Regions:
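Sec-dependent N-terminal signal peptides
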Residues: 4-13
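A short, N-terminal "cap"/entry segment at the start of jelly-roll beta-barrel domains
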Residues: 18-63, 78, 128-130, 137, ...
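Short, conserved beta-strand element in jelly-roll/cupin
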Residues: 68-72, 81-98, 200-204, 215-230
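Short beta-strand His + acidic residue motifs that chelate non-heme Fe in jelly-roll/DSBH
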Residues: 77-79, 98-99, 107, 115, ...
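Extended, hydrophobic interaction surfaces within ordered domains
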Residues: 88, 96-146
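Short acidic-glycine-tyrosine-enriched beta hairpin
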Residues: 102-117, 235-255
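A short hydrophobic beta-strand segment most commonly corresponding to one strand
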Residues: 129-144, 220, 252, 267-284
Length: 287
């Protein structure tokens, strides 16, 4: 007993400290369009950005995956069906065929749709050009009652959604409110259980959405075009950490993390961000 205790005391404290890993407050990934020559005909490839397939997936609470399907000409992705999971598809590039239950629906660049639990769905490419689709998946806690799914998906194009300012944010950024909860009425699609907002932000030169935080939600930003500075966490000043960001930069923010964006302050500088936010369950209700 004494020898064992002595051996433990002789172990350097640094060795013991190395056993643990501190969870990140936010995550950054950078994505780029795939090389068309690297995509085999007839295939569907999934690239994880956050969540499933990413090494830091354990810190996500409600988001199960955020990534991109690359579907080659005449390719088709495997069908999915989740009992307690909802998804959003957003077509980044190309023309798609959405399989929803036993029906098919066309989708084109900048189309988006909501996919409820308990409905089989998949995406296919019937064209001769490459297809890229963002896929976002969210876990629905057992305490939430799930109703009957819509017989057909609602598909909306980004261009059909009006820009507007949002209370609490400066007029230097305009929003397109794409998707929200079933209890809402302001979004183009209001059918979600845990997704509180899926939205597009358009910043004028020098514009910002003013850094803020959400105490009970996690959020993802994807810079679609333009350049600026992402705000992530408190930084060295304890207020906001600012990091250069350009098209293809994606950020995941844990609950209560400071989040925001500053566009470049020069003539003609525009920036657009696609963002999604989902509420998290209380700590004692995690599934």
């Amino acid at each position: 007993m004494f020898k064992t205790l002595l051996l433990f005391l002789l172990i350097p404290s640094g060795v013991l400290a190395q056993e643990g890993k501190v969870d990140a407050t936010w995550l950054h990934r950078s994505i780029s369009p795939p090389n068309k020559n690297d995509v085999q005909a007839g295939t569907c490839h999934y690239k994880p950005i956050f969540g499933e397939g990413d090494p830091d997936n354990r810190i996500l609470r409600t988001v199960t995956r955020f990534g991109e399907f690359t579907v080659a000409a005449n390719g088709k992705c495997q069908a999915a069906l989740y009992d307690r999971q909802e998804e959003i598809y957003f077509v980044v590039e190309g023309n798609a065929v959405l399989h929803y239950a036993d029906q098919t629906y066309p989708m084109r660049t900048n189309d988006f749709t909501y996919l409820p639990p308990a409905v089989s769905h998949s995406i296919a490419n019937a064209s001769g050009q490459m297809l890229r689709v963002l896929v976002m998946s969210f876990k629905i806690p057992a305490r939430i009652s799930i109703g009957a799914a819509a017989p057909a998906p609602k598909i909306v194009n980004l261009d059909a959604v009006k820009k507007q300012t949002v209370e609490g944010h400066p007029a230097s950024v305009q929003y397109k409110l794409l998707l929200g909860p079933r209890t809402a009425t302001r979004d183009a699609i209001d059918q979600a259980y845990v997704v509180t907002s899926f939205f597009w932000m358009d910043f004028v030169p020098g514009g910002t959405n003013f850094p803020h935080h959400h105490e009970a939600a996690e959020e993802i930003y994807l810079v679609m075009d333009g350049r600026g500075e992402i705000v992530a966490g408190g930084g060295t000043d304890g207020i906001e950490g600012r990091y250069p960001a350009a098209a293809g930069d994606a950020y995941y923010f844990r609950p209560n993390c400071t989040v925001g964006f500053y566009n470049q302050n020069k003539p003609g500088a525009t920036a657009n961000i696609l963002a999604v936010r989902a509420r998290i369950p209380p700590p004692d209700e995690d599934d």
